[in-house]
Amino acid sequence: MKHNMQILQELAAKNGPLCVGLDTDPSYIPESILKTFKSPAEAVLEYNRQLIKKIADDKSACCFKVQIAYYEAMGLEGIKVYAETLKLVKESGLICISDIKRGDIAATAGAYARAHFTGDFETDIITINPYMGFDTLKPFTEYCTKAGKGIFVLLRTSNPGMVDIEQKELKDGGRVLDQVGNELKRISQEMKATYPDQTCSPVGAVVGCTEESDAKALRDAYKDIYFLIPGYGAQGGDAKICGTLMKEAGGTVNSSRGILCAWKKDAGCTAKVENGTVAMSDIVEAAAKAAIASKEDLLRF
């Protein structure tokens, strides 16, 4: 059995390293289109449906990352759209990363693991916050072993506030993120041993591409760990930094707003928005073009 991180690594080699983030806020859809649907959640689902199909057909990405918060913000209907979006990604043949960033005591973590690795919200890979301790990872890694699931653990994030904790120096030397990384390396190696015939571990790391200064050092320190790389595009990270982070075991580079809101920089779309003739297919086409351009940009490195 191949685990999902291995499948993702292989899809990235085949389709390119782009991950399309489905952080689909209703405000990312033109008002004139929103008005044609019964609810904002219904409009979001249709945008996701058309975009997932187009991206899969174009082979411009290896996976989708679905940020649960945007769906929770739409209430019960939004949660239903979240579940339906996960199914649409699964049907596309690409990997689904659920960006849930869960982290809690082991008993609660077990409930989170069941919630997102089985049932209505079942997904391929999830993001995990390790800051309540590494024992909180065990319920998730158990699913990596028995069901081929994968996890990305926060290591060096892409937000400016990461300096508040991740970059803090420890009295015994090194930074907080280095201590997290060393433990993550140990866990990743243990998990890799359960899949000796595969080229990566089901345990990966989230490493943002907004800081060039330590990109090479991080890649060198964690050569055998597959990276989820946020921060490309709207957050200011560039393809050169991504190229450094994608070396060794590799990685997938996420872009969300840069793709979902690409219509705002498309002259044809903005003209149609102004005269009230823009259709969902127009903003999907703009997003698809942005995905192809992002893939080509990333492949330069």
Task: Give the role of each language-model region.
Residues A12-A13, I52-K59, L86-E91, T141-A147, ...:
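Acidic (Asp/Glu)-rich catalytic clusters
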Residues M1-V66, Y71-E84, K90-E91, A279-L299:
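Conserved N-terminal beta1-alpha1 strand-loop-helix module at the mouth
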Residues V20, F64, D99, I126, ...:
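Conserved, mostly hydrophobic/aromatic
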Residues C242-M246, C261-F301:
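C-terminal helical cap(s) of enzyme catalytic domains, especially alpha/beta-barrels
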Residues I100, D104-G204:
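Conserved anion-binding
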Residues K14-L18, K59-C62, S92-L94, E122-D124, ...:
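Short, well-ordered coil/turn segments that N-cap beta-strands
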Residues A205, C209-N254, G258-G268:
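A C-terminal functional module that forms or caps the active site or interfaces directly
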Residues D57-C62, V66-G119, M162, E211-A215:
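N-terminal active-site wall of soluble small-molecule enzyme domains
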